[in-house]
Amino acid sequence: MLYRRNVLIRLIAGGLLLASGHKVSAEAANFSYTALITSQGKVLAQSPVWISYVNHAPRAGYFSDYKVVLEEGAFDRSPGFCAVSVVDVDSLDDVFYAQAKLSGTPTRHSVKVITHQIGSADPQANASKSFMLMCAK
């Protein structure tokens, strides 16, 4: 009898944990914004629609600057958190040396990103890289 009660308690606790996790993930979906942006600054995918356009300014052999301009009203205030990561894997140099970084503090109007390639044998390597951007309220 004690065994059945313990099993029942574990099942109920597990169900509550799953239900609360589902609620948290549903709420998190409302507060996270993601985008895939090409090395030329074209937005390939975004969820939800939160990016108006991207200004791309390449600096040959050094870095590429991207200003991601946000849709009006996407953020009432500056994002609480943003992260960026290079997704180019065309060569081993891209895998090992390509980097993307936030360039300054994100605002409710824009997020600045730079991409560059460090340690490459080619000093004139293309610094423009495709990247994924994620911001959260």
Feature names for model-found ranges:
Residues 1-4:
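N-terminal secretory signal peptides that target proteins for export/translocation
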Residues 7-8:
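N-terminal export leaders
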Residues 11, 15-16:
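N-terminal soluble segments of membrane proteins
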Residues 17-24:
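C-terminal segment of classical bacterial N-terminal signal peptides
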Residues 25-78, 89-100, 105-137:
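Extracellular receptor-binding modules and their adjoining Ser/Thr/Gly/Asp/Asn-rich linkers
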Residues 83:
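Cysteine-dependent deubiquitinase/ubiquitin-like isopeptidase catalytic cores across multiple families
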